[in-house]
């Protein structure tokens, strides 16, 4: 506020003022001890004259005032005791009015006036009216403000309100209100005028110091809020209009903001609701620089809490049309305050929506109306780039998700997706993730194609690239999390009616196909499994599974074939092969042999043309064999074709051990442990013997390249297959076959440098232990094992 020299001067002036107060207070106390009224008045007036200074800032003046205030309390005690000064309080009240300077005179008058009221020798209202009028004589902003603050303080417990010791006639409450209102009005005028004190160069610091004095003015409103007998009618007709008149007319940013805050905080919620129109009208008349959004937000928060306090008050909100009034007021504020940044408007919409969801959660039209107003405002700006505004829009969109446990409710809001369209790509994804998380958290089921359409429009930022953003630029971990969330969401889409479920699948498929090669491997599998689940549902319900109805397994399999085919162009052949096999198994369960055969054909074509990696080939072969084993829909010709292909691929794998394992796995294709399953023991034996030859070749290659035959694991694995089929009753597997294989393994182990013991291979040891256990156990199976010598 001041230069360094000015600050030093001010400190010096404050020190001089305090010294003056202390000096005169010393003589005043001597006079008090001597009960010398004339000297008391003389030195108290001199002491209070120090408050006449105009050299101090508000903060420094406050320090000086508090020193004088402490002395005035001692003076009041003296004035109360008539035996000490010998004058009736009426005469004393007249006497102090002869003090030379007006400021000391008024402080003394207020002090004696307090004693005068307490003596009840005059009505409280008359004394207070006299004092509040005479205080007009001090018009210096700082001196006048502190004088009236002193008057408010000494009169607080002496107001003529209902139930007090100073209660008067029928209009007693009005008298108390009138005094406080008059003092408030004058104090606010003085407070506002402080900003014009001193040069313009010190305005910023002056405003800060003026802000520190705001409670001196605000205390009057707190007193008004606590006066007994101020009912709704008096508040509506007198108190609020007078206070708001002063707020609006003062044309001061700081005063308007602070006083509106005070009004909202100190008066009852019920009063705010019943005077909502008046209060909101004042908000629209505030200075453009006033942060009206905070004022309105605080008002809506209070009203929301009031509504939540009891269901009985909700009808009051409907009676006064609270939502319509708040909505109109917010619209006016946004339209008139042209300088309000977009974040301010969004904050107001968030507050209004929060109010609506708490007070009228059943009125979706209100919720959609707020979102619609937000769309209009967002459409008026070229592009939403303010991060704070974006955060508020996310809060706006999140509020319905948090309020309604069923996400379907939010999907019915027509303006919801229109708000999301104004988000940037990154924020759109954040919001889409929040929507999916809300569905997962509440375990919501989206059960109609229309709602799925709306939902996938909302989360399109996760499904496809927006604004030409390249998916390759995204963080891999974040990208995977997003796509896994979409995959989980697909499993939450369900309907018991097959036709509607098929519509849902088609809607999802249409959206997912726009996702590009990087997303499809995440999103296609859950779609396929969802469709397969529908197929199994139809199969369990019976009916014409290949008929002309809109939802039949045959038609669903056509969609599945087209969907999986897209994966082959990604390319993602291993995943496509797995899905083809899943569909083949489902087609088998529906007894659709041609469809199942077609899916196997597609799987074999992928294997031949797309899968070149040796490890991937091994995995694919075992998947093919495992699936083919479980399928029993094929006739002899088709099954022979497929099993021949599978065994042929197995024998052509790159590594001998892989060949061996794949070939002996094919043995299960000819012996299915099921009453109706195929049981071709001869071909089982052929597979096992072929596997044995491959294992032997692998041993010879190991011996040639490494100088030792290596482990006998392959032989032991084949031995276990022999034992399996032997126990299953394959007549072509005999004890002598098992015996020969055991001896072969023993020989292989002993020939490896001649120092390997029988027990060096745990797998082989465990297998022999099993055979021994079965032999000892006896019974039919034990008898079968008897010819085998260990």
UniProtKB/Swiss-Prot annotation:
GO terms for biological process: protein transport; retrograde transport, endosome to Golgi. Gene3D superfamilies: Vacuolar protein sorting-associated protein 35, helical subcomplex Vps35-C (1.25.40.660). Pfam families: Vps35. Disulfide bonds: none annotated. Expressed in siliques and maturing seeds (at protein level). The keyword Cell division does not apply. Keywords: Cytoplasm, Endosome, Golgi apparatus, Membrane, Protein transport, Transport. It is found in: Cytoplasm; Endosome membrane; Prevacuolar compartment membrane; Golgi apparatus, trans-Golgi network membrane. It is a peripheral membrane protein. GO terms for cellular component: cytosol; endosome membrane; Golgi apparatus; retromer, cargo-selective complex. Plays a role in vesicular protein sorting. Component of the membrane-associated retromer complex which is essential in endosome-to-Golgi retrograde transport. Also involved in the efficient sorting of seed storage proteins globulin 12S and albumin 2S. The VPS29-VPS26-VPS35 subcomplex may be involved in recycling of specific cargos from endosome to the plasma membrane. Belongs to the VPS35 family. PANTHER family: VACUOLAR PROTEIN SORTING-ASSOCIATED PROTEIN 35B (PTHR11099:SF6), VACUOLAR SORTING PROTEIN 35 (PTHR11099). Component of the retromer complex which consists of VPS29 (MAG1), VPS26 (VPS26A or VPS26B), VPS35 (VPS35A or VPS35B or VPS35C), VPS5/17 (SNX1 or SNX2A or SNX2B). Component of a retromer subcomplex consisting of VPS29 (MAG1), VPS26 (VPS26A or VPS26B), VPS35 (VPS35A or VPS35B or VPS35C). This is Vacuolar protein sorting-associated protein 35B. The gene is VPS35B.
């Amino acid at each position: 506020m001041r230069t360094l020299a000015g600050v030093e001067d001010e400190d010096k002036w404050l020190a001089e003022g305090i010294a003056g107060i202390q000096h005169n207070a010393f003589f005043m106390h001597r006079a008090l001890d001597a009960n010398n009224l004339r000297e008391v008045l003389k030195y108290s007036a001199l002491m209070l004259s120090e408050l006449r200074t105009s050299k101090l800032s508000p903060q420094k003046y406050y320090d000086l005032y508090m020193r004088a205030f402490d002395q005035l309390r001692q003076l009041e005690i003296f004035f109360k005791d008539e035996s000490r000064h010998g004058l009736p309080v009426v005469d004393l009240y007249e006497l102090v009015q002869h003090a030379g300077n007006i400021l000391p005179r008024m402080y003394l008058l207020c002090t004696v006036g307090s004693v005068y009221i307490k003596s009840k020798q005059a009505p409280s209202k008359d004394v207070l009216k006299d004092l509040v009028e005479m205080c007009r004589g001090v018009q210096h902003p700082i001196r006048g403000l502190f004088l009236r603050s002193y008057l408010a303080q000494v009169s607080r417990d002496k107001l003529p309100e209902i139930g007090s010791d100073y209660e008067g006639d029928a209009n007693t409450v009005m008298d108390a209100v009138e005094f406080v209102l008059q003092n408030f009005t004058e104090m606010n005028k003085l407070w506002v005028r402080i900003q014009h004190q001193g040069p313009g160069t010190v305005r910023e610091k002056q405003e800060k110091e003026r802000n520190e004095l705001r409670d001196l003015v605000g205390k009057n409103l707190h007193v008004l809020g606590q006066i007994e007998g101020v009912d709704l009618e008096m508040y509506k007709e007198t108190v609020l209009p007078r206070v708001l008149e002063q707020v609006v007319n003062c044309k001061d940013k700081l005063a308007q903001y602070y006083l509106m805050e005070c009004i909202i905080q100190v008066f009852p919620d019920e009063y705010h609701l019943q005077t909502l129109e008046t209060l909101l009208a004042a908000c629209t008349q505030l200075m453009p620089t006033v942060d009206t959004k905070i004022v309105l937000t605080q008002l809506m928060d209070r009203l929301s809490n009031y509504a939540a306090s009891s269901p009985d008050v909700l009808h009051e909100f409907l009676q006064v049309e609270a939502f319509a009034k708040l909505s109109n007021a917010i619209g006016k504020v946004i339209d008139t305050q042209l300088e309000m940044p977009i974040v301010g408007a969004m904050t107001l919409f968030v507050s209004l929506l929060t109010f609506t969801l708490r007070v009228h959660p059943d009125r979706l039209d209100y919720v959609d109306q707020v979102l619609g107003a937000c769309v209009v405002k967002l459409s008026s700006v070229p592009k939403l780039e303010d991060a704070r505004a974006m955060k508020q829009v996310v809060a706006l969109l999140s509020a319905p998700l948090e309020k309604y446990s069923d996400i379907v409710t939010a999907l019915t809001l027509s303006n919801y997706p229109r708000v999301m369209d104004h988000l940037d790509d990154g924020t759109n994804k954040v919001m889409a993730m929040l929507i999916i998380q809300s569905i997962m958290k509440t375990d919501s089921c989206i059960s109609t194609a229309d709602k799925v359409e709306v939902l996938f429009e909302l989360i399109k930022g996760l499904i496809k690239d927006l604004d030409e953003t390249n998916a390759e630029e995204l963080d891999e971990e974040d990208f995977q999390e997003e796509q896994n969330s979409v995959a989980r969401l697909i499993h939450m889409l369900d309907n018991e009616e097959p036709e509607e479920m098929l519509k849902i699948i088609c809607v999802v498929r249409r959206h997912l196909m726009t996702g590009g090669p990087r997303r499809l491997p995440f999103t296609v599998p859950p779609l396929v499994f969802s469709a397969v689940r529908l197929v199994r549902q139809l199969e369990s319900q019976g009916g014409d599974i290949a008929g002309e109805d809109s939802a039949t397994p045959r038609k669903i399999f056509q969609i599945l074939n087209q969907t999986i085919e897209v994966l082959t162009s990604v390319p993602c052949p291993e995943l496509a092969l797995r899905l083809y096999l899943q569909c083949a198994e489902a087609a088998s369960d529906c007894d659709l042999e041609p469809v199942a055969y077609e899916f196997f054909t597609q799987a074999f074509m992928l294997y031949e043309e797309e899968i070149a990696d040796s490890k991937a080939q091994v995995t694919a072969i075992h998947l093919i064999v495992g699936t083919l084993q479980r399928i029993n829909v094929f006739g002899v010709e088709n099954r022979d074709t497929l099993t021949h292909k599978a065994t042929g691929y197995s024998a052509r794998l790159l590594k001998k051990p892989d060949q061996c394992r794949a070939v002996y796995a094919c043995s299960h294709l000819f012996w299915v442990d099921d009453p109706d399953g195929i049981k071709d023991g001869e071909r089982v034996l052929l597979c096992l013997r072929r596997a044995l030859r491959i294992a032997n070749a692998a041993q010879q290659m190991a011996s040639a390249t490494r100088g030792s035959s290596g482990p006998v694991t392959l032989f032991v694995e084949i031995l276990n297959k022999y034992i399996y089929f032997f126990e299953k009753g394959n007549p072509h597997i005999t004890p002598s076959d098992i015996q020969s294989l055991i001896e072969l393994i023993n020989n292989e182990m002993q020939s490896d440098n001649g120092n390997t013991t029988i027990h060096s291979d745990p797998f082989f040891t465990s297998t022999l232990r099993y055979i021994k256990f079965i032999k000892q156990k006896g019974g039919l199976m034990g008898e079968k094992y008897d010819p085998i010598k260990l």
